[in-house]
Regions:
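Residue-level detector of conserved, well-ordered beta-strand and adjacent loop positions
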Residues: 72, 81, 179
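Short beta-strand to alpha-helix junction loop
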Residues: 79-101, 128-130
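Beta1/beta-strand and adjacent pyrophosphate-binding region of the FAD-binding site
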Residues: 1-14, 34-36
C-alpha cells in the first residue's frame, strides 16, 4: 500500500477544486496526493450555478453568465439587474476535463476507488470529513431538473428566472428555476 502526503476523499466539485488549487499554487511540489473517487469516468453529470462574488479559476468552464434575473409570485413579476455579481453556470464536463488534464500531468497525483487502497497506519490524519450525527430537522431541500431543447426560440437567454412561485405550493414551498443557455435550450428545475 502506498502512503500519501495528502488524501482528498471525493473527486467531485469540491475535492477536485481543492486538488487543482494545490497544484496551481505549487503545494504539491515534492508531495503526493491521493484522490479517492468511486466513479469510473468523468462526464457531464451536473451543472453548477452560483453568484460570482470574486474572480475564480474556472471562467473557461462557464457556459453562461447572466446579469438579470426574475422572481415571480402570485403578486407579480420582479426583474432585477445585478451587474456586480453575475449569476454563472459551469458545465461539469468542461470542469472535469480542465482539472483532470492538469492533475494528470503530475505523476505525484493518484486516483483510487477506495480508501482501503491507501496505507494510513502510523499516520497523523486530519479528518475534515463530516461524521457528526445528522440533525433530523423538518427542513428538506430537493431539486430535480432537466435540460430541454425546443424547436422554436422561446427563452430570453439574458434573464434567469431564479424563482417562479406560480405553482401549487401543497403546504410546502415549491418553485421553478429556469436557466436559459440559449433562446431554445434551458435547464428547468
Amino acid at each position: 500500500m502506498k502512503e500519501f502526503d495528502y488524501i482528498i476523499i471525493g473527486g467531485g466539485c469540491a475535492g477536485l477544486s481543492l486538488a487543482y488549487e494545490l497544484e496551481i499554487n505549487n503545494k504539491l511540489k515534492e508531495k503526493t496526493l491521493a484522490i479517492i473517487e468511486t466513479r469510473d469516468e468523468y462526464k457531464r453529470d451536473k451543472t453548477w450555478s452560483f453568484w460570482k462574488v470574486s474572480d475564480h479559476n474556472f471562467e473557461d468552464c462557464v457556459i453562461k453568465s447572466w446579469n438579470n434575473f426574475t422572481i415571480n409570485s402570485s403578486e407579480g413579476f420582479h426583474e432585477l439587474i445585478n451587474k456586480s455579481f453575475p449569476y454563472q453556470s459551469i458545465n461539469s464536463e468542461k470542469f472535469y476535463k480542465k482539472i483532470n488534464s492538469k492533475l494528470n500531468l503530475n505523476p505525484s497525483v493518484s486516483y483510487f476507488k477506495s480508501l482501503n487502497e491507501i496505507n494510513s497506519e502510523n499516520s497523523l490524519i486530519f479528518n475534515s470529513v463530516f461524521e457528526g450525527k445528522l440533525n433530523k430537522s423538518k427542513l428538506w431541500q430537493h431539486f430535480q431538473g432537466i435540460e430541454i431543447e425546443t424547436p422554436n426560440d422561446i427563452f430570453d437567454d439574458e434573464i434567469v428566472n431564479l424563482m417562479d412561485f406560480n405553482c401549487d405550493q401543497k403546504n410546502d414551498v415549491h418553485f421553478f428555476y429556469t436557466l436559459p443557455f440559449s433562446k431554445n435550450t434551458a435547464l428547468i428545475e
